[in-house]
Amino acid sequence: MHRLTLLAALLCPALATAANCSLPTTLDQRQFTNLSDPLYAPDNPNAGRMVQVSFAGSQYVLDILGTDLRIGGSYHYQRLTLHTAEIQMTEAHPAGPTHYTLLLTCLSDHQGRFIYTQHDGPIAPRQRQNSGRWTLQP
């Protein structure tokens, strides 16, 4: 959790002041395409993975592109500032529940960066962080 705070403090102010953008007030009926940073590290087993996330009400469906894997879950979205937001997610992964947070910053109204923090989950390491890019579909 301390790494999330440190990364947010380092990344968000620079991105927020450099961009004239805003994050949506709600994710209901919206869809993201996310690409994790491609550099492999032992604490980033999903490096380079692209997913599509569809939100409806308090539920989401995550499709791991290039695979047949589709995972559902619940989420809570909160826009923290015009340029930053947090999504708390609980995923119903086939190997067991995964709890994670996405911290979003925008570069434009439809694109930005995210920091993924897994608090607990079935895929080792159980706690980890990585980052990537998000694109909000029109």
Report each predicted region and the residues it spans:
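Tryptophan-anchored aromatic micro-motifs
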Residues: 19-47, 75
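Positively charged n-region of N-terminal signal peptides that target proteins for export
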Residues: 1-4
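Beta-sheet ligand-binding and adhesion/scaffold domains
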Residues: 86-138
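Short, hydrophobic/aromatic-rich segments at coil-to-beta transitions
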Residues: 26-33, 57-61, 82-89, 111-113
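N-terminal glycine/threonine-rich, aromatic-flanked beta-hairpin/loop signature
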Residues: 42-80, 112-122
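Hydrophobic h-region of N-terminal signal peptides that target proteins for export
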Residues: 9-18
